[in-house]
Amino acid sequence: MKKTKIAGICLIVLILAAFVSVPVYNNYCAYNVEKMLCETPLPEQTELIEAISQTGKLTGNGNGMQYFGAILIKSELSLEELETYYSDYRSNEWEYLVEIQEGQSIKVIEHKALQFSEEIEDSGYYIVYSWGSGNSLLKELDI
């Protein structure tokens, strides 16, 4: 009787730990994407304004977990110059993507509302973003 009770308590603790640890791990994966962007040297005439990350089903159809990281930069360089600069850091087609940022809302995120806190009132703001990956088993288990 005592062993059954202890085994039951252990099982409950393991299940509760999974409910906490899997989302924490997935958020950590998204944070690593953000960190990678922040640690990348900025081009000249460019300043880092803000960084953000998000995990979840963010775009497209089907299931699965997506890890998104982005930085908001203000630059005197053109979009083409920034794309050329960041293309040197790309290891695949989902990293270091550059777009003009108008307003606070991040438009590449379809299924969640994600926005920068910085008010964007004029031109010269760009978003540099990457889609990351993590352990394929845990990304399917986010609760």
Where are these regions (language model features)?
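An acidic-aromatic pocket/loop used at catalytic or ligand-binding sites
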Residues: 2-69, 74-143
